[in-house]
């Protein structure tokens, strides 16, 4: 914080972060600029992902071809919202879907086991899968029908939302933090009431 006060200029990656800084250090307001994070639109471009890459991804993750794919690309940490997403999925389990939690399989074994048990308790056995990180994230996003970003605490911005939208995939997130700046509700995705399971399920 002291270093922040001594800088000539401060760059925030979102208006959310800007407001947070000003709430704690109003004296930097006049030397603070918002520069939103970007995305490599050559890498995350659906026109640059060939069918072979998609097939390899589908086969590697054994993704069913006849079910909609809900994807949560995030490391396995509690604030990323894996548990609340499982709760929301339990409310729509009468509908066909498979949920891929990309990256969650690399998490701490105790937390991964906890998520698996919790999903089973909710009656979601066989409906969700925790996988390691994938090398070809653009191809993975092409497989998704919708991308979930249910962080239970506000993201400063959230790169996943931009990458998914660049690939033409809608994003469902809670309406707080940087998500309110990167997602156009009803156009490029849906913003649910923060930490509301029913609202997330509806979205």
Regions found by a protein language model. Give the residues of each.
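A short, active-site helix/loop in glycosyltransferases that binds the activated sugar's phosphate group
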Residues: 7-34, 39-43
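Short Ser/Thr-rich beta->loop micro-motif in glycosyltransferases that lines
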Residues: 74, 132-133, 149-153
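Acidic donor-binding loop of glycosyltransferase active sites
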Residues: 142-156, 169
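A conserved nucleotide-sugar
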Residues: 58-68, 82, 86-129
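Short hydrophobic beta-strand element within catalytic cores of glycosyltransferases
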Residues: 170-173, 183
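Short alpha-helical donor nucleotide-sugar binding micro-motif in glycosyltransferases
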Residues: 133-134, 140-144, 159
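Short alpha-helical segment that forms part of, or immediately flanks, the ligand-binding pocket
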Residues: 138, 156, 161-166, 180-181, ...
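Conserved acidic donor-binding segment of nucleotide-sugar-dependent glycosyltransferases
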Residues: 185-186, 190-197
């Amino acid at each position: 914080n002291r270093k922040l006060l001594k800088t000539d200029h401060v760059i925030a990656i979102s208006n959310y972060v800007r407001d947070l800084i000003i709430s704690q250090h109003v004296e930097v307001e006049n030397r603070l600029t918002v520069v939103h994070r970007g995305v490599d639109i050559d890498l995350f471009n659906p026109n640059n992902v060939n069918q072979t890459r998609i097939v390899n991804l589908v086969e590697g993750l054994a993704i069913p071809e006849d079910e909609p794919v809900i994807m949560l690309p995030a490391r396995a940490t509690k604030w990323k919202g894996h548990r609340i997403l499982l709760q929301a999925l339990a409310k729509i389990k009468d509908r066909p879907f498979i949920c891929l939690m990309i990256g969650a399989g690399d998490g701490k074994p105790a937390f991964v086991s906890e998520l698996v048990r919790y999903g089973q308790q909710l009656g979601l056995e066989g409906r969700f899968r925790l996988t390691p990180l994938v090398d070809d994230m653009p191809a993975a996003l092409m497989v998704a029908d919708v991308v979930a970003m249910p962080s239970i605490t506000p993201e400063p911005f959230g790169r996943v939302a931009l990458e998914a939208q660049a690939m033409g995939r809608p994003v469902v997130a809670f309406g707080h933090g940087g998500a309110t700046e990167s997602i156009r509700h009803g156009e490029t995705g849906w913003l649910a009431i923060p930490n509301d399971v029913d609202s997330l399920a509806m979205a």
